[in-house]
């Protein structure tokens, strides 16, 4: 997938979502409902590592969006029932269009009449790497190959999501249908972690 699909679905004169231009800067309309960029000092991410973000999206149907940085974009999966840290509870994850890297900072309200209309919160964020290496370049090479093969295993280092996870493409379904799986490790639990609210969710309005 490429960012062309992302751009074709959106009117950036009417949505605050980021449109990454050729210069790498967001070209969204700043006069509309604002997207909230988290202050760089509050980030848990580290330089030299791949980043991830999980959005909680109150669209026509509540769902979560897992976004993994790879090759200059955010590889994205919609998880209808939300993420899990229970190895017995595999969750459907539908692969959607790639999103621009700017989207990892996005938090705001997409106005009615636009694709994906509804409130978007950053639910969790952090860094991740391929299973077996923390090196960014080696991780990228491994993850790229694993996505192509339909089975990737990675380590998440977020505020909520920690430890080993896998994404596995379903062979007898749509090529967009994957399973999001928590591996059995010290961070596994039978609690429903998706019930935890996003940090900004209790605020009456986005800044």
Model feature map: region roles:
Residues 1-207:
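A charge-rich, low-complexity, intrinsically flexible signal that marks solvent-exposed coils, linkers
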